[in-house]
Curated annotation (Swiss-Prot):
It comes from Varanus varius (Lace monitor lizard). SUPFAM superfamilies: Globin-like (SSF46458). PROSITE patterns: GLOBIN. The lineage of its organism: Eukaryota, Metazoa, Chordata, Craniata, Vertebrata. Monomeric heme protein which primary function is to store oxygen and facilitate its diffusion within muscle tissues. Reversibly binds oxygen through a pentacoordinated heme iron and enables its timely and efficient release as needed during periods of heightened demand. Depending on the oxidative conditions of tissues and cells, and in addition to its ability to bind oxygen, it also has a nitrite reductase activity whereby it regulates the production of bioactive nitric oxide. Disulfide bonds: none annotated. Keywords: Cytoplasm, Heme, Iron, Metal-binding, Muscle protein, Oxidoreductase, Oxygen transport, Transport. Nitrite binds at H65. It is an enzyme of class 1 (oxidoreductase). The keyword Acyltransferase does not apply. This is Myoglobin.
Length: 154
């Protein structure tokens, strides 16, 4: 299920538009995930008590976490599928420490595509969106494989 060179170029090119403003993109991704899938918010002790959109938008911790998530994802995407070195420690912490189900990775990946589509509509057409979805599916599948190796049934 690999991506073609052309698809990877689309992924890396759009990520180049996202990177200059990771805090804003990351914050929007986390907020939208919590709004669309409220059960995900319960996994975050720091964010459990943020009840309103204003509270979420004003949380520096939430913005920092969103930045951390997208920074890690950017490193993975830039590896164009050769991301084992980045995936291994991420799977370890997400399986053993945070206990994040793969389903939640599906949720956040779809939110990421939606946020990029809104913020960069002129540069993120259907073909680029499909390439990003394929890249994110590859990431999730590799995380799921690592989870299995670690004995986590997430």
């Amino acid at each position: 299920m690999g991506l073609s060179d052309e698809e990877w170029k689309k992924v890396v090119d759009i990520w180049g538009k996202v990177e200059p403003d990771l805090p804003s993109h990351g914050q929007e991704v986390i907020i939208r995930m919590f709004q669309n899938h409220p059960e995900t918010q319960d996994r975050f002790a720091k964010f459990k008590n943020l009840k309103t959109l204003d509270e979420m938008k004003n949380s520096e911790d939430l913005k920092k976490h969103g930045t951390t998530v997208l920074t890690a994802l950017g490193r993975i995407l830039k590896q164009k599928g050769h991301h084992e070195a980045e995936i291994a420690p991420l799977a370890q912490t997400h399986a053993n420490t945070h206990k994040i189900p793969i389903k939640y990775l599906e949720f956040i990946c779809e939110v990421i595509v939606g946020v990029i589509a809104e913020k960069h509509s002129a540069d993120f057409g259907a073909d680029s969106q499909e390439a990003m979805r394929k890249a994110l599916e590859l990431f999730r599948n590799d995380m799921a494989s690592r989870y299995k190796e670690l004995g986590f049934q997430g």
